Amino acid sequence: MKNKRFLFILLCSILMTGVHGENPPAKVVFEQYMNQAQTFAETYPREKAYLHFDNTSYYVGDTIWFKAYVTLAEKQVFSSISRPLYVELVDQAGHIADKQIIKLTQGEGNGQFVLSKSMLSGYYEVRAYTRWMLAFNEPHYFSRTFPIYQLSNSDQLERSISTYELSPSMETRPEETKEKLSLRFFPEGGQLVEGLTSQVAFKAESKSEGEINLSGTLYTQEGQEITSFETLHDGMGCFEYTPSAKPAIAKVNYHGKDYKFSLPKALPNGYVLKINNNAGAISVEVACNASTPQDTLAVFVNHQGRPYAYQLISCQVNKPQSFTLLSRKLPPGVLQISLINRAGNTISERFVFSSPRAPLQISPNGLKTIYAPYAPIRCELQVNNALGEPIPSKLSVSIRDALRSDYSAYDNNLFTDLLLTSDLKGYIHQPGYYFTEASPRKQKELDILLLVHGWRKYDMSQLIGTTPFVANQAPESQLVLYGQVKSTILKNKLKNIDLSVMVKKDANIITGQTVTDENGYFSIPMEDFEGELEAIIQTRRAGKERNKDASIFIDRHFSPAVRAYDYSELHPKWSSIDRW
């Protein structure tokens, strides 16, 4: 009897183990991913920074004035997450020439860089970020490059930018390594699959001319012509291509010389993601070839880290699966459309732009064409919504000397930066060009821009919970001094070390204490202040007055890596002021 009872219990255990060991249905898996991603977006909202400058170029001896805005990326409202904003002036060699910490009040702040007359002229980058913006695996920060000229001593309005050689031992700003002529290809969705037609974007660049316009022809490796192609705008274009096992060859002629470029090799099996962004709707299609194992996947539509929708896809050979998204139900800006499998891996990805439905209109009133020298200027600004109704607004206005200002009609602005360029890789040349009019050509050019500069695998594993998220930086609700205490001799991390802090502010002395954690780290909240303060930090181990075998390291090197300049940044094409 005991043996029978034992056998019965054993059989029940085996059956229950089998039930629990089954893979859950795809709908359940992706629903869990959706819920996890929603929770992640609520827990870890992202920030964006934008600086409004008083000019587009400067002279040595000038002052760069700016107004800072920090917003919640998803909701486009002022952020209250971060209090300090770090703003850096980086020279042409990649060294930080000046740095300021701006106090934000409900997402707003202001500051300036004084350009001393002893500094070298050249192209300088201003970048701005909060620590929380650097917390994610793909840190984002605001960046803008300005020419700073040397003003001539003559009566003529002449200006120049100096060039200088650096010692080979000095660190320099990284450079983009380009061939004499480069032609790069960007398959839609990130990959080509044998036998499946894909849209392929391309970008043509010259080391000496930057973005160039050209045309060419696509051939098989046996020499059979497939199709022709040409650039549409700023060296970019696209064509349709059905790959085979052998990559096609692109042939172009530029300045009388023939060039050959190979397309990316196609995968023997897999999925192709196709997007058609029409007025009022975005259609999504997923196709697979006969060699692809049948499976159920999901297409996720994300905006600034938050999923807005997902659709299950069970792709079959010669039966592409498709669905449509209504544009009016989507948030404005760059959307990430990702195809993921049950394991949470991104199979294919595509960026698409969702246009804002009702942009605000700003109308200046009361301006004159000509003013007498030193005469006061009065101007009223009216901000209306799409219905013509006035709405309350916070504005910053820049007033420039037309004769001493470079002007680009399609330069970056608040609209293009927050909704477009801040979500793309690389430097975007004159982003305002893509919004000068609502036309099929501009829509096509913008779509190609996203194919080129949005081409990457957007890792959703942390978003959906398949990979743990560990923030690289902590949000700062106030200015905090971070550091670490180590042994001077052995370089060991010293835990449970008492630190006493004494800060002199005007005629007042501020004191405080803290203790290092198990890894020797410490943090000291700082009071509000402006300018520079003198501080003394001392260490003490329990039972001793001072700990002489201790070194204090201040964490001040968390800036993002310096990027390479784009050709267009060093060779700007300024518009004449007659075209203002």
Regions found by a protein language model. Give the residues of each.
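Short amphipathic beta-strand segments in non-cytosolic proteins
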Residues: L85-K99, G216-S228, V301-Y308, S398-S405, ...
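Bacterial Sec-dependent N-terminal signal peptides
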Residues: M1-Q32
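Short, acidic Ser/Thr/Gly-rich low-complexity loop/linker segments typical of extracellular
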Residues: I101-T105, S228-D234, T511-N519
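Surface-exposed, low-complexity/disordered segments
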Residues: F40-Y44, Y59, S80, S116-S121, ...
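Contiguous segments within soluble domain cores/interaction surfaces
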Residues: A26-E47, H52, Y58-Y59, T63-K103, ...
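Ligand-binding face of N-terminal immunoglobulin V-set domains in extracellular IgSF glycoproteins
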Residues: G111-L115
